[in-house]
Amino acid sequence: MQDYRTPQRRPQRPQKPQKRHRRRSFGAVMLTILLCALLCLIGIFAAVYFMGVRYIQVRISDTSYVKFLGMVDDEGYPYKGRIIYSDGISAEVNLDRNQIAYSNGDVYEGELNRNLLKEGRGKMLYANGDVYEGTFVGDLISGEGTYTYVNGDVYEGSFANGVKEGAGTYTFADGSTYTGSFSNNQKNGSGEYRFAEGDAYIGTYVNDLKEGSGIYTYANGDVYEGQFVADERSGKGTYTWSNGEQYIGEFQNNMMSGYGTYTWPTGREYTGYFENGIIVRAAESAGT
């Protein structure tokens, strides 16, 4: 007899959990973690900000700048932290002590402007042993000051844009002194040079060399008064020896060269042409 009972269905296998649900759960966890991390970072930055820590960049010119990372005061101006200059040198600044310690070993103590540039009175101690004490303008030595070199030389006078400019006195370690005009770090203009061995020169200079009119007095009593070219007696001048002899005439390369008159204490006199300090030809007499 035919069995009309409803066929039984096979029991279905239990379905595996959908992976997408797991992915959604993992993504939610990661999102929560990221949000927490972001909030923590925001909190840290906010705390740092309210503590007064800032990053500031100041452009000095088209090619130079100063970067600062550190503490600022109530007005937002930096006073303690690290400076990085466009030339690669870095420094630690502490305005509580008015000091900047550079990475190359230099140390500055003195006044600074709001852009952390040396401005006003200050003292610069260089790593090589040189010391400058005086005024600064725009981070450069400018104005009146004293620069002491490690070898014992000392310059006291005017500066501009980091170089000797104007009136000043340079004292050498051996005792020689120059007092007069400077330009672009060199003796330029009128000045007086007194050598340690007793010589003295009063006259004009161009780029550290005697040039133009001057008087040179030698330690032995000789005196030359006349023109100089490239640190040598050249042109017209008068040389008087300590024994009374005298030459008035033309010079070249420190020697009597050209037309001149040589006189002796006895009254003897020679007028003619000289070459490298030697008489070569007497002057022609009138009517010959």
Residue map of PLM features:
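N-terminal Lys/Arg-rich, disordered targeting/topogenic segments
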Residues: 1-26
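N-terminal Sec-pathway targeting helices
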Residues: 19-39
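Ser/Thr/Pro/Gly-rich low-complexity linker/stalk segments immediately outside membranes or between
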Residues: 48-76
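Beta-turn initiation residues at beta-strand->coil junctions
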Residues: 58-61, 83-86, 100-105, 123-128, ...
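Conserved anchor residues at repeat-unit boundaries in beta-strand-based tandem repeats, strongest
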Residues: 67-79, 83-96, 102, 107-118, ...
